[in-house]
């Protein structure tokens, strides 16, 4: 698969050719996770509507839930104003975090909401 050249032209990548991808749950608005994508991962996501990312440590693509069953159905993909990050609006089945929690952002609260 290859990414539409019009979309590719809008992306700003880091030195490794990657950009960040934020997954947000459609029904709750919860931010679920942040991962990396490159053009191929984005093209696969747009084609299949499955959250597809690039693993920097394994140097390979991975589809969310492919081994765990905790899948992401992608409803929308939005590009941020700088072109260096995408937002995926998803339906999350099961845990989004590899630790087994719903979101990767529920472990350490560094600043709590004021009461």
Curated annotation (Swiss-Prot):
- Cofactor(s) for this protein? Mg(2+); Zn(2+)
UniProt xrefs under InterPro entries: PRA-CH, PRib_AMP_CycHydrolase_dom, PRib_AMP_CycHydrolase_sf
Enzyme kind, highest EC tier: hydrolase
Pathway per the UniProt entry: Amino-acid biosynthesis; L-histidine biosynthesis; L-histidine from 5-phospho-alpha-D-ribose 1-diphosphate: step 3/9
Report the leader peptide range: none
GO MF terms, alphabetically ordered: magnesium ion binding; phosphoribosyl-AMP cyclohydrolase activity; zinc ion binding
Q: Which amino acid positions bind Mg(2+), per UniProt?
A: 80, 82, 84
* Keyword Cell inner membrane among UniProt keywords: no
Task: Kindly indicate whether the keyword Disulfide bond belongs to this entry.
Answer: no
The alphabetized list of GO BP terms reads: L-histidine biosynthetic process
Query: What UniProt keywords apply to this chain's record, in alphabetical order?
Result: Amino-acid biosynthesis, Cytoplasm, Histidine biosynthesis, Hydrolase, Magnesium, Metal-binding, Zinc
Q: Which GO terms describe its cellular component?
A: cytoplasm
Q: Which Pfam families match?
A: PRA-CH (PF01502)
Compartments in which it is found: Cytoplasm
| Annotated cofactor note | Binds 1 Mg(2+) ion per subunit. Binds 1 zinc ion per subunit.
Which reaction(s) does its UniProt entry say it catalyses? Answer: 1-(5-phospho-beta-D-ribosyl)-5'-AMP + H2O = 1-(5-phospho-beta-D-ribosyl)-5-[(5-phospho-beta-D-ribosylamino)methylideneamino]imidazole-4-carboxamide
Q: Which domain of life is it from?
A: Bacteria
* Ligand binding (Zn(2+)): 81, 97, 104
Q: Where are the transmembrane segments?
A: none
Q: What is its EC number?
A: 3.5.4.19
Q: How does it assemble?
A: Homodimer.
Family indicated by similarity: Belongs to the PRA-CH family.
Q: What does this protein do?
A: Catalyzes the hydrolysis of the adenine ring of phosphoribosyl-AMP.
- Official protein name in the record: Phosphoribosyl-AMP cyclohydrolase
Print the organism lineage.
Bacteria, Bacillati, Actinomycetota, Actinomycetes, Mycobacteriales
Q: Name the gene that codes for it.
A: hisI
């Amino acid at each position: 698969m290859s990414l539409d050249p019009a979309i590719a032209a809008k992306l700003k990548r880091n030195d490794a050719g990657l950009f960040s991808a934020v997954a947000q749950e459609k029904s709750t608005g919860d931010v679920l996770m942040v991962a990396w994508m490159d053009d191929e991962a984005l093209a696969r996501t747009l084609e299949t509507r499955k959250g597809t990312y690039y693993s920097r440590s394994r140097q390979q693509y991975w589809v969310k839930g492919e081994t765990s069953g905790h899948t992401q159905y992608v409803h929308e993909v939005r590009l941020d104003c700088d072109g260096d990050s995408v937002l995926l609006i998803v339906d999350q089945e099961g845990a989004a975090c590899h630790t087994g929690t719903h979101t990767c952002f529920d472990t350490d609260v560094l600043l709590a909401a004021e009461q």
